[in-house]
Amino acid sequence: MIFKDVGVIGYAEALRIQEQLVAEVQQGGEEALLLLEHLPVYTIGAGGDRGNVLDPELEPVRVNRGGDVTYHGPGQLVCYPILDLSRRGRDLHRYLRFLERFLVELCAGLGVGCHTVPGRTGVWTGNGKLASIGVGVRRWVSMHGFALNVSPDTAPFSRINPCGMPGCSITSLSLELGEELFVDELKEMVAIRFQPLLNLHLPR
C-alpha cells in the first residue's frame, strides 16, 4: 500500500489526486491511502439535502460520495483510502463498518472512548460527533473516506446540520483530552495501524 501525505490542500486538487489513484488501482496498481488536511470547504454527498445548509450564502461542493453536508478544514485529519474492494469482498456496508472500527480503535489508543450510533455512519463520544465517513466507489475501487476532528475550529459546523443531523454537536480529540494534538501525530498512527487492520478485517 502506498501512503501519500499531501499536507494542506484544496478540495479540487485532492479530488484530482484521488481520481488519478483510482484509475491506477483500476488498472492493477497498488492500493493507496491519501493523508491530508483540507483548506476550509463545505461538501455535500450525491444524495445530500440542500436544506441542511443553514447559511443561505453557503454553496457546498456536490461530490460523488455518500452522506450529507459536512465541513473540512485545518486541524482535521482527512484520509482517503483508494482500495480495490473487488478483491476485498465487494461489500460496501462491511467496508464502512471497518472504517468505523478502525477509528474507534485508533481513538482508544489515545485514551478517547468513542462509539458508533445505530443507523448512522461515523464515530461519536458522549460530547458529540468526532469523525465523519463518506465514501464513493468506482468499479469497486473506493474513494473519499473519513475525516477525524483532531483540533479544528468547530465554529464553521454551526452553518450546517452536520451530516444531516440538526443540533449535532461536534467534538475533537483535543477537546476530549484537554490538550492540543496535531494532525501530523495522527498521520503517523494511521500509517502504522491502517493496513494491518484492513488486512485483518477485509483480507484480499
Swiss-Prot record:
Matching InterPro entries: aa-tRNA-synth_II/BPL/LPL (IPR045864), BPL_LPL_catalytic (IPR004143), Octanoyltransferase (IPR000544), Octanoyltransferase_CS (IPR020605)
Molecular function in Gene Ontology: lipoyl(octanoyl) transferase activity
Keyword vocabulary terms for this entry: Acyltransferase, Cytoplasm, Transferase
Lineage: superkingdom: Bacteria
Catalyzed reactions: octanoyl-[ACP] + L-lysyl-[protein] = N(6)-octanoyl-L-lysyl-[protein] + holo-[ACP] + H(+)
Transmembrane segments: none
GO cellular component: cytoplasm
Active site per database record: C163 (acyl-thioester intermediate)
Similarity comment: Belongs to the LipB family.
Listed NCBIfam families: lipB, PRK14345.1
Protein name: Octanoyltransferase
The organism's taxonomic lineage, starting at the top: Bacteria, Pseudomonadati, Thermodesulfobacteriota, Desulfuromonadia, Geobacterales
